[in-house]
Amino acid sequence: VGKSGKVGTSVATVSALAPDAPVAVAIYWYRRYLEQGGHARNTIESYCYDLALFEGQTRPKAIEALKARDIAHFLGESETRSTRKRRLTSLSGFFKYLVGAAKVLSVDPSENFYPDPIALKTPRPLFAAEQERLLAAAAADSARAHAALWLMLRLGLSRGELLTLRTDHIDLADPQAPVVYIYYDNPRWKGKERHLAASAEFATIYERLLDEYAPDGLLFPILPQSVNKIVERVVEAAGLGRDDITPQTLRDSYAVDQARAGADEDRLIAVLGLADDPRNRLSVGRYLKLGAPPL
């Protein structure tokens, strides 16, 4: 098996998946499973790269012969905590597939391993006055900049969500209470979909965007790097004196404002479109701490 996780042979000669199958064969079928499940290409390549390294280290063992010590040895060669965590994620998914979906193993040799915790950085949200200066500078810059920054700062959209937003995702039936719908093409991310209440202010901003750019389909047909450049340009024009403001900073600021307004952990998970898992619970805990009343 190559480092991409692809078996160097034709599909017709790949044997069926069974307990005595080589690791390389199991990786081939796992890759097929991920592809059919609609996983992102980069995710599949990352998983299979780690699994190919694991296969090279454990060859010629069959999957039924793999033990916890094989997992420990592979993880122990990780040079950083982030590499160890990524490798464990790759192995965990692989063995969950073999035990659960494929049902060729009865025991997961990786189940008693846990990732080393990687501390989450405390965000530096924008204060209310900074937010107003930023939006004023965005309005002076362009209709596109104004709409983009407003959506990230006032509704907490991520950069990726901003770039997939379309004209038919904006409901202006009531201009005093517009609704912005966040959709995902990949079925795996349906849980992140949501609809967010905007304001009459956004209706005005949106109408200006339509007038100046007449978008056909995508509201922001630009590259991710272009969003970063817009934010950098507007931050400089606003004279905030900070060089650490990114699209994520705007989303963080929204989340902290929501926490100040009374949002709890469940509410933050929902409005931010996050998966309900322990890591994200820890993440929104940072917003709750920053949004709590001062001591």
Predicted features and spans:
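N-terminal DNA-binding module of tyrosine recombinases/phage integrases
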Residues: 1-36
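N-terminal core-binding DNA-recognition domain of tyrosine recombinases/integrases
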Residues: 28-121
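DNA breakage-rejoining catalytic core of tyrosine-based enzymes
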Residues: 117-133, 189-200, 215
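Short, basic (Lys/Arg/His-rich) helix/loop patches that form interaction surfaces
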Residues: 214-216, 232-270, 274-277, 289, ...
